């Protein structure tokens, strides 16, 4: 491992993103609604500044945050910002980065390529998100029926089991449990050591026997959340600042 694994929730930290040991080998997701929170958590964890409400920053806090980040970017601390999961996988597999923002399918793909890659379980807590499907009140007839059928399909069990192999959770996990092997359920949801090798959605081995999911069980991980991804009141104010960061 290039970045030594620490003790979950004790020594692992968002501040690792700013550690000078990884200078030039750090990347973040190119999305101010996501990557901004990763960097804010890192800056706060490093003790450079504190936010009154990190999920809804003031303009003054946003300016102070970028005052911390721009000099780092100008000195080449960040390798770049990725715009897609395949791009993040390529960066990791090509050794362009050793630590970065990543989504679960990317981590599964890197492990599937035979390169050890794991999430940190930061002592400050996770940045969490939840995706939803919304139906317009103006939808009627066959279109509405098809939309409900699609949403019901997502909750039918099989889709939740499929995305579990990428590391994602679903809101009704018990429905998906029957579509997962006991070994898969124990690893992905219960936080137990993998009884056997487990495969990702491409059929590649992404979990070795005996390994434990970073952060532990579903309950343990959901109990350690620092901030939920939201669109802040000052989201639009962050856009030109984020572009300034990318171009620095």
Language-model region placement:
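Periplasmic-binding protein-like
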Residues: 62-73, 113-137
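Alpha-to-beta junction loops
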Residues: 22-25, 93-99
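Extracytoplasmic ligand-binding site segments that recognize negatively charged/polar headgroups
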Residues: 1-87
